[in-house]
């Protein structure tokens, strides 16, 4: 069983100031035994965190913070992954398009499968949840 953790941490792969390995070392120093890296719209730092976590006995739950919209408000949706689902190439491609604000490209690939809630250039919360499922 885990005793102390943080499930919303950003690394230098988004707007954080520490590399994933530095985050693990700091978590260990602060007696955390479980964390999740949830960078904005990418999963690039997770492998580094998992490797460093194993060295330091800190469990790492792979995660991401997806940028979406609800009406006129920005809403971040957190997704947490079992095993290595975060390495899925389609997911990585979609996250890259969200990061580069190329929602039109996502619409072309998924328009018949996902409801985009009337947005043309943004992801609604509902779409974000479907993508992370």
What are these language model-derived features?
Residues 1-73:
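An N-terminally biased module of ancient metal coordination in phosphate/nucleic-acid-related enzymes
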């Amino acid at each position: 069983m885990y005793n102390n953790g943080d499930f919303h941490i950003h690394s230098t792969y988004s707007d954080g100031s520490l590399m994933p390995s530095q985050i693990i070392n700091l978590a260990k120093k602060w007696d955390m035994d479980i964390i999740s890296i949830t960078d904005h719209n990418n999963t690039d730092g997770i492998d580094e965190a998992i490797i460093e976590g194993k060295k330091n006995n800190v469990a790492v739950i792979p995660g991401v913070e997806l940028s979406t919209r609800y009406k006129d408000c920005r809403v971040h949706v957190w997704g947490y992954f079992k095993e290595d689902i975060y390495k899925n190439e389609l997911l990585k491609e979609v996250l890259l398009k969200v990061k580069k604000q190329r929602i039109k490209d996502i619409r072309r690939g998924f328009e018949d499968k996902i409801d985009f809630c009337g947005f043309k250039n943004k992801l609604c919360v509902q779409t974000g949840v479907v993508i992370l499922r």
